[in-house]
Amino acid sequence: MLKRISTQQLTLGMFVEAVEGTLSNQRFSQRHRFLLRHEELMRQLKLSGAESIIINTAKGYDAGSSARSAAVSPQPDNCPETVAAVTHAVRSAADAIAETFASAEAGGSVSLKGMATATGKISDAVQSNPAIFIGVTRLKSKDETTFVHSVSVSGLMILFGNYLGLDRGTVDLLGISGLLHDIGKVEIPSSILNKADGLNANEREIINLHPAFGRDILSRNAQMPEMVIDVCFNHHERMDGGGYPSGRAGGEISLYARIAAICDVYDAVTSVRPYKKPWTANDALTWMLRRDGHFDTQLLKKFALCISASLPRS
């Protein structure tokens, strides 16, 4: 049910469908619909000059709810219908990226329209229930690892972009960037991609070429946004210069590529795969924070808070 309330009635756990009025902070007019999870975001929204807020009481708390205002979010709705809807969105997006990869492998260009549609589905799934989305995308069979990984990274980048308060257009491009960050792997032999044990030095050199391959594939489309190409080419760069393909460091790496690096590694180590056990979110984030020089430390700390707020408390 949609309901119009004043900004002073806002509480954490409400699902915001729209912000009405002439805003001093224009980012709220460009944001996706979102679940209000964080005190700072709520404070900024109350100071934005909004005349009223449209909330969806079916997806979050109602005004005057007896729920404690200190709660970060409502408990995830784990009913079969919700799980089925999120699973369908993930599979649909995975199918879309699989078709895109096949087209790229055959020499075709990437359709931005198709990727935008897939990103919209991912965004809806993430915003409706991030915990279920993260849970569904952790499960990856051998045949679909690359595709579901792409969907998962896309969703994590959307989730984190919204947490950071980025505008809607930027968050949309983050989602597309996540979907396409590994497209260069279509040029890598499947025997290397699907190898369960460690890669030898020669195989590692080959797989390290995939960012450059991806940049070239994406550049076939003259309308491809620079951010998408940047993320594809630089998501394996590291803050200390120890990454690849160019050994960029610090300020040479864009915010968007830094976000992608965090989301890419987080999904990789927390995923359920046939040949390894997944790490818990806490173990993954602890390990990542200890990797001195790999990630943007301040950004990673914010990502940890974002994930903590998105997953149910044990």
Regions found by a protein language model. Name each.
Residues 73-208, 215-222, 226-227:
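Acidic/His-rich, divalent-metal-binding segments that scaffold phosphate/diphosphate chemistry
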Residues 179-186, 227-236, 255-260, 275-277:
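A glycine-rich, aromatic-flanked flexible loop/lid motif
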Residues 34-35, 164, 197, 222, ...:
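Helix-turn-helix-type domain boundary/helix-start signal
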Residues 45, 195-217, 238-314:
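Divalent-cation-assisted or electrostatically stabilized phosphate/pyrophosphate-binding catalytic cores
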Residues 1-110:
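Membrane-cytosol interface segments
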Residues 46, 127-131, 158, 184, ...:
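Signal for well-folded cores of large energy- and translation-related assemblies
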Residues 118, 139, 174-177, 210, ...:
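Short acidic/histidine-centered micro-motifs embedded in hydrophobic/aromatic stretches
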